[in-house]
């Protein structure tokens, strides 16, 4: 077991693209510039760096030089600007160019980067925003990371046992009955063939907090891009009930395909 004193701090660059509304090129630039300005206030700025790519490249290097530690880069919803503009090919292409310029730093400054994690709800082809990169690994369906985005059975039984006991008492159930009900409603997610199953963390934690068995996943909202895609394809939703796809098919999906 590693002690907290054994861990080494490193500069962290966190970019959240989830909250923006990207109706123009400027709206994306404003979001990126706001993040870059905050980072530059801590690690310094260079006037000659006049676009988001150069500024990001420069601040990553300066963070390493100032701290002596390679940086961590975290991007939430890396694909949000493109997904908001499905159907607007012209704007989408402009936004893609900006994102490609920004994300290219992940390759050019690789020697200064210790770790990077980009999350999103879609998968883009190599010909999209990451076309210049060959150092990214898609771990969406990777067994080594299959439990990363959920709560395992072991974690539920150990760290969350007191909350389960409280929920059981509140609902007039035994501890085992409560576990069975939680498993029935919120378990069953697998991110690789024969991998460990995980519980939906949003639903499970809300159930334990509220001590009620509800369909909490509805509260996460429906991705607007999914609604738009369904409108464009006239797909019958009832066909999805028993639809199965191979992992190869999932890995070939490009959510912003123009056709």
Predicted regions and their residues:
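Short, small-residue-biased leader/transition segments that mark boundaries at the very start
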Residues: 1-4
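Structural recognition of the conserved hydrophobic beta-strand(s) that form the central parallel beta-sheet
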Residues: 14, 72-76, 97-101, 114-121
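Substrate-engagement module of ASCE P-loop NTPases
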Residues: 60-64, 93-114
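Conserved NTP-binding/hydrolysis module of P-loop NTPases
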Residues: 9-44
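Short glycine-rich substrate-engagement loop in P-loop NTPases that contacts/grips substrate
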Residues: 27, 43-61
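Amphipathic alpha-helical segments of the small helical/lid subdomains adjacent to P-loop NTPase cores
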Residues: 128-131, 139-207
